[in-house]
UniProtKB/Swiss-Prot annotation:
PANTHER family: PHOSPHATIDYLETHANOLAMINE-BINDING PROTEIN, PROTEIN CENTRORADIALIS-LIKE. GO terms for cellular component: cytoplasm; nucleus. Not known. In plants homozygous for the recessive allele of the SP gene, sympodial segments develop progressively fewer nodes until the shoot is terminated by two consecutive. inflorescences. CDD domains: PEBP_euk. This is Protein SELF-PRUNING. It comes from Solanum lycopersicum (Tomato). One of its GO terms (biological process) is negative regulation of flower development. Belongs to the phosphatidylethanolamine-binding protein family. The gene is SP. It is found in: Cytoplasm.
Length: 175
């Protein structure tokens, strides 16, 4: 069953380009505007993801803590992502079986603003070894590395991940 859960992440090149292969062990749900659920590979326009989503962790218990990272691995464009990855959000110390509003926001939410092509926006959930594992915010949102961040903070592999696609909304044509 775990390989079935990973399949969209492999096809979407999240596993490989963003993180190494892992088996999801916790269920995570991401919902924008109370009714727009994020499913792997689904498309959203920037106008529908302006506010931070509700992210629920369905696993562990109140003594388990999680770190959520949201990144864009396709900056500035998917054909030449030389600024990979762009950090959009970090929330730490999220108790298991709750949502991210119970955690500590280390880096505030930044809405997706893809300029060139279709970008993937990836939510990664890591289980912390203990509370307050993350000591400080990254210096820059640009050229962030999920792998390096996980390693530096001893987070290990993700326990859950989901991504959506997003592209610039077409401007109204003038006549």
């Amino acid at each position: 069953m775990a390989s079935k859960m990973c399949e969209p992440l492999v096809i979407g090149r999240v596993i490989g380009e963003v993180v190494d292969y892992f088996c999801p062990s916790v269920k995570m749900s991401v919902v924008y505007n109370n009714n727009k659920h994020v499913y792997n590979g689904h498309e959203f326009f920037p106008s529908s993801v302006t506010s931070k989503p509700r992210v629920e962790v369905h696993g562990g218990d109140l003594r388990s803590f999680f770190t959520l990272i949201m990144i864009d691995p396709d900056v500035p464009g998917p054909s030449d992502p030389y600024l990979r990855e762009h950090l959009h959000w970090i929330v730490t110390d999220i108790p298991g079986t709750t949502d991210c509003s119970f955690g500590r926001e280390v880096v505030g939410y930044e809405m997706p603003r893809p300029n060139i092509g279709i970008h993937r926006f990836v939510f990664l959930l890591f289980k912390q070894k203990k509370r307050q594992t993350i000591s400080s915010a990254p210096v820059s949102r640009d050229q962030f590395s999920s792998r390096k961040f996980s390693e530096e903070n001893e987070l290990g592999s993700p326990v859950a991940a989901v991504f959506f696609n997003c592209q610039r909304e077409t401007a109204a044509r003038r006549r």
